[in-house]
Amino acid sequence: MHNAYRMKRSLLAAVLLAACTQPRFEHHRSGSTDWMTGSFLREHAQCRTVRPDGQPDAEAPCLIYYLPPMPDAPPQTALGRHFVQIEFSDRREVQIPLTADRRHQLSFQTGDGIAIQPQGNGWTRFRLAGEDGTHTVFDSDTQILDYLN
């Protein structure tokens, strides 16, 4: 009897934990928040900074936002382009432009100080050059492009 009670309690705890976890992806309609006017997709992912010796630090939660072009915005302007915005747990953020091919498949735009390399283990390494010559290097397990495409 005691083992059955313990099993039920463990099963209940697992069900409650699964019910409380956030979904990986959340869709938000235009005007659904007070800080972003257009529609967007948010991913709950993991990021880790990379030390100068190339070794990654500990994982920390990060938020990945897909920001689609604003309707009627010219494509040559920032508002007319696709972006991914990454917010780190320490409140830093970076934006990476996306490009769409003829089949409307999105990919990270590289060049102009942006280098992106899949690590082969579910993580992707991002190296972004700042305007002041500094570099931001981090890994993320983001799946946002797979989800969008």
Please report, for each region that a protein language model flagged, where it lies by residue:
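N-terminal secretory signal peptides that target proteins for export/translocation
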Residues: 1-5
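Sec-dependent signal peptide recognition
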Residues: 6-13
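C-terminal motif of bacterial Sec signal peptides marking the signal peptidase cleavage site
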Residues: 18-19
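Cysteine-centric segments in proteins
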Residues: 24-149
